[in-house]
């Protein structure tokens, strides 16, 4: 399991070439020794015009807007981040396309984390309820309050389709921290980052029942 430290300065869809100079060779070594590799992909995209994910997303108007229709930025592991608007079919197609080159490194599975979405400096640890999702297809324009519970579900759909396109005929291994009913067709779930406390044990009961 490769967490955010395998990334280049926490940029999603990148690998830290200093510590992992040859990821294809490393993953082949793992395969030869009976292991599979699962890499993390979060929704937060570092705001950096020289970073290909942010640059291509910005060109396609792929990110969530604030109430004033400006691109919303919130802090996550890389610092200031933009967040894909997965209600837009064009955004889901763009996100799916990012998996092809990434999976070509010999990656076996993906875990989508922080996809409630988690925003460190946002109200309640997420983005403002009045942020705007533009929708498209059968999804109307709406506030984040309307789409919060669906955000992770729409993300894993895009991730699943990208993994299928990258490795046709191979069943994807995709794990998600956030999902809703129906999303299990795309990704399994886990119950988040739990601690060994009675409070978290109590919370784990309804969470496990609804997996």
Predicted regions mapped to residue ranges:
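Catalytic-domain carbohydrate-binding cleft regions of carbohydrate-active enzymes
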Residues: 1-211
């Amino acid at each position: 399991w490769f967490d955010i430290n395998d990334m280049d300065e926490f940029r999603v869809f990148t690998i830290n070439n200093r510590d992992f100079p040859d990821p294809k060779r490393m993953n082949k070594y793992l395969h030869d020794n009976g292991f599979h590799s699962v890499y993390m992909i979060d929704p937060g995209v570092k705001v950096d015009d020289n970073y290909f994910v942010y640059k291509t997303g910005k060109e396609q108007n792929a990110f969530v807007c604030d109430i004033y229709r400006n691109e919303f930025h919130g802090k996550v592991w890389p610092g200031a981040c933009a967040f894909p608007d997965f209600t837009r079919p064009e955004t889901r197609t763009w996100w799916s396309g990012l998996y092809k080159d990434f999976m070509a490194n010999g990656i076996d599975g993906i875990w989508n984390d922080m996809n409630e979405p988690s925003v460190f400096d946002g109200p309640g640890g997420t983005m403002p309820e009045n942020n705007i999702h533009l929708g498209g297809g059968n999804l109307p324009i709406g506030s984040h309050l309307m789409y919060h519970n669906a955000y992770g579900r729409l993300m894993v759909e895009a991730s699943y389709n990208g993994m299928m396109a990258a490795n046709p005929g191979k069943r994807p291994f995709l794990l998600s921290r956030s999902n809703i009913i129906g999303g299990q067709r795309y990704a399994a779930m886990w119950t988040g980052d739990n601690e060994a406390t009675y409070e978290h044990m109590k919370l784990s009961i309804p969470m496990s029942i609804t997996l």
